[in-house]
């Protein structure tokens, strides 16, 4: 009973010590609870010291790594000042090293995070090494404890402190690097915001100026004071309903430039508002470091947004441009006038037909509206004179119905007498095409290998140098895109000539050595698969397997049928 009371008193003092910590996280060895525990130690009572050691171990086993570090300071203080407390620890150090150094991580692991556990281990190793220097010469138990810690595989007694120190330095280096990255990112975002802010201030001034010019304000004058309520003796009252208060601006020659500047500034400001929104969103991952900059960007964006919304209230009425109808024909084609022969042929055909009136109206409509309906291209029916054009043929024999020809309803004509065709069939017809040849006065002017310029004239394309383009006195294209096309054409021509030259060299080599040169095989996936799949042996093997599978399946399903056999 007395021992329990004594333990409860020690626990109270220990809890008060842990509660009365200093600002730097160390124990206050001048406090009253610590002096009470120290007085218990100084009594040199073995039972009291044993109870104190057990209470400290129980408190450490129930606490986290942070509180264990404070208890470890008490262990170090009492270990150095009390021989009885030192004997209690060195007689059975197993529980102490399990709690402080995690020598049995499976059954008794350290609570909390890994970083806190490593910090507790490093401090414990530092204290134990200090104990070894002080008491290892005179106390064999201290030597045994050090040897045990050196042999255990869960504690790196020699290099553990170095590794923990390296881990701490690496963590500090990473924190410093992260801080530098954050600072660099903040400076980059800040410079971007300053650039955008300069541009936005200029656009803001331009937008406000154009708004004042388009919709001037008459309320800024302080010369005339108009009272809000004017006294009147009349009993009549009027009600006015204004449907829309937003101003309407009609575009004319006087304010065209102002309206254009107003719309341009408003459009660019809308884009800048979106850019500032993206900047503020990009600063969110930086959390505390970028909150102030993000808040300033958001506040400035809201101011510009209000100005843009105010500018949106102004309605602008523009004149509708006349819609130009698209041309139905291409400009590359040339209109051909209707020839007199065509008109006469139509008239003669109309006189011979029964419906003269209906047929006469069509050419009149064509002549009256030549722009609406295009003239049809003249064509002639195909005949033997076109097939044998330029040849003189007379009394051409025509074969009879030979038996080798296909016929179904009548029998073959067995006579071998050939017939003749009338001479008029082969008489060459004459066609008159009336029209004016287009004038061609555009020269190619491309530079020839001799240094002179190509004098070939054509309408659209030179057969040697491609489409006709504008060139200067040296034969170089004037436009950049034409110059790039010219360079591309020359490069393709050079590659083609090089390929032909290499092919010619290969042929000469093969003719001299009388053996063909091995060409490089393709190394693509498709070529390798083709070589494997289309190999004759592979096809034969696969087809044999497929045939045997089909035969076995047929025999299994239809072997009992007589027709299958």
From Swiss-Prot:
Designated name of the protein: UV-stimulated scaffold protein A homolog
The record's listing under InterPro entries reads: UVSSA, UVSSA_C, UVSSA_N_a-solenoid_rpt
Intracellular or extracellular location(s): Chromosome
Q: Say what the protein does.
A: Factor involved in transcription-coupled nucleotide excision repair (TC-NER) in response to UV damage. TC-NER allows RNA polymerase II-blocking lesions to be rapidly removed from the transcribed strand of active genes.
What Gene Ontology terms for biological process does this UniProt record contain? Answer: response to UV; transcription-coupled nucleotide-excision repair
Q: State the residue spans of region: Disordered.
A: 510-530, 542-565
Q: Which residue ranges are recorded for the region named VHS-like?
A: 11-156
Q: Tell me the gene name.
A: uvs-1
Kindly list any coiled-coil regions of this protein: 155-215, 480-510
């Amino acid at each position: 009973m007395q021992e329990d009371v004594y333990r409860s008193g020690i626990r109270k003092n220990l809890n008060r010590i842990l509660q009365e910590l200093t600002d730097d996280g160390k124990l206050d060895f001048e406090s009253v609870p610590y002096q009470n525990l120290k007085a218990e130690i100084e009594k040199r009572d073995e039972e009291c010291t044993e109870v104190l050691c057990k209470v400290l171990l129980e408190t450490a086993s129930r606490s986290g790594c942070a509180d264990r570090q404070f208890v470890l300071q008490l262990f170090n203080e009492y270990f150095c000042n009390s021989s009885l407390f030192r004997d209690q620890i060195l007689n059975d150090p197993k529980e102490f090293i399990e709690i402080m150094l995690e020598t049995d991580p499976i059954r008794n692991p350290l609570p909390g995070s890994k970083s806190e556990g490593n910090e507790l281990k490093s401090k414990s190793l530092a204290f134990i090494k200090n104990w070894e220097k002080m008491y290892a010469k005179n106390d064999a138990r201290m030597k045994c404890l050090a040897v045990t810690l050196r042999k255990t595989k869960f504690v790196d007694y020699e290099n553990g402190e170095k590794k923990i120190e390296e881990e701490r330095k690496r963590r500090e280096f990473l924190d410093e690097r992260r801080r530098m990255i954050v600072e660099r990112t903040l400076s980059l975002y800040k410079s971007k915001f300053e650039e955008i802010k300069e541009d936005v201030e200029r656009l803001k001034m331009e937008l406000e100026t154009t708004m004042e010019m388009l919709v001037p304000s008459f309320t800024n004058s302080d010369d005339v004071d108009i009272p809000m309520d004017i006294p009147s003796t009349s009993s009549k009252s009027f009600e006015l309903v204004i449907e829309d208060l937003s101003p309407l601006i009609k575009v004319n020659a006087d304010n065209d430039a102002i309206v254009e500047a107003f719309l341009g500034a408003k459009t660019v400001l809308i884009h800048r508002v979106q850019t500032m929104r993206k900047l503020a969103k990009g600063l969110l991952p930086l959390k505390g470091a970028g909150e102030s900059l993000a808040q300033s960007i958001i506040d400035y964006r809201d101011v510009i947004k209000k100005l843009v919304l105010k500018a949106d209230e102004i309605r602008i009425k523009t004149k509708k441009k006349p819609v130009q109808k698209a041309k139905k024909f291409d400009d590359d084609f040339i209109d051909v006038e209707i020839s007199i022969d065509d008109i006469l042929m139509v008239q003669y055909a109309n006189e011979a037909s029964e419906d003269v009136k209906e047929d006469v109206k069509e050419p009149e409509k064509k002549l009256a509206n030549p722009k609406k309906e295009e003239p049809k291209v003249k064509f002639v029916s195909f005949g033997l004179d076109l097939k044998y054009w330029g040849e003189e043929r007379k009394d051409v024999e025509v074969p009879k119905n030979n038996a080798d020809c296909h016929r179904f309803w009548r029998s073959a004509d067995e006579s071998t007498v050939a017939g003749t065709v009338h001479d008029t069939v082969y008489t060459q017809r004459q066609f008159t095409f009336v029209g004016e040849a287009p004038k061609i006065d555009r020269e190619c002017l491309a530079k020839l290998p001799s240094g002179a310029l190509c004098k070939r004239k054509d309408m659209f394309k030179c057969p040697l140098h491609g489409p006709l383009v504008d060139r200067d006195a040296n034969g170089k294209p004037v436009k950049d895109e034409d110059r790039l096309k010219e360079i591309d054409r020359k490069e393709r021509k050079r590659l083609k000539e090089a390929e032909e030259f290499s092919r010619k060299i290969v042929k000469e080599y093969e003719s001299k050595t009388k053996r063909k040169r091995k060409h490089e095989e393709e190394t693509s996936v498709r070529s390798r698969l083709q070589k494997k799949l289309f190999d004759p042996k592979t096809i034969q093997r696969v087809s044999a397997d497929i045939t045997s599978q089909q035969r076995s399946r047929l025999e299994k399903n239809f072997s009992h049928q007589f027709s299958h056999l």
